[in-house]
Design a protein with these regions (language model features):
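Catalytic-site neighborhoods of secreted/periplasmic enzymes
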Residues: 3
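Active-site-adjacent beta->alpha loops and helix N-cap segments on the catalytic face
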Residues: 190
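Polysaccharide-binding and catalytic clefts of secreted carbohydrate-active enzymes
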Residues: 6-178, 182-187
């Protein structure tokens, strides 16, 4: 809602060109933003407390079509921290990514950019893995409070796009009871 955007503008995603997204667009939010996650968890918890034991509720859908990453400095820092945890040292990262080959060697974690289209294959793969882990943790943040407050017979899913390769669907689906896919017939994209 507009009040949320106005009160918490930091929860808007930063596009690849560096511009902040505007209110009113689809997927205008930053999945990695702590405030956004806190608010989503609060809504999920309240809904689960209210409807979690309702016999007419058969399941829960966390979200719809993860697809829009944020490219701001906050996400870049989270990515760099993720890389530190994964590789331990820059020497290890540089060796694993073969950065010496094209003079791409990093000497400080802050030098590592966000890149998803061109560049070092190790960087591209690591970004995709980071995005997968980010979506999974965003989802698990809500999944945990739903599970704690709902009937165990209610399934939990999220809706994914089978043709979208911006993340690893298997990683994102690990904590779900089932993975869902939508096919929007009539939109022309399958012609």
């Amino acid at each position: 809602p507009a009040w949320l955007t106005q009160k918490y503008p930091e929860r808007l995603r930063i596009k690849e060109d560096g511009r902040r997204d505007e209110h009113g667009n689809r997927e205008q939010f930053n999945w990695a933003n702590p405030k956004y996650r806190e608010l989503c968890r609060g809504i999920a918890e309240k809904m689960a407390q209210r409807y979690g034991q309702n016999p007419n509720v058969i399941g829960w859908q966390i979200d719809n079509e993860y697809a829009a990453e944020s490219y701001g400095p906050d996400v870049q820092k989270q990515f760099q921290d993720w890389l530190k945890a994964r590789y331990g040292t820059l020497d290890n990262l540089n060796e694993r990514w073969t950065t010496a080959y094209w003079s791409e060697t990093y000497t400080d974690w802050s030098q590592i950019p966000i890149e998803e289209k061109y560049g070092n294959p190790g960087l591209l793969l690591s970004w995709k893995r980071f995005v997968s882990d980010t979506y999974r943790s965003y989802q698990k943040n809500q999944l945990d409070v739903i599970r704690a407050n709902s009937d165990k017979r209610q399934f939990i899913t999220t809706n994914m796009m089978g043709w979208f390769d911006g993340y690893d669907h298997y990683t994102v689906a690990q904590d779900l009871d089932l993975a869902s896919w939508d096919d929007e017939v009539g939109r022309g994209h399958l012609d």
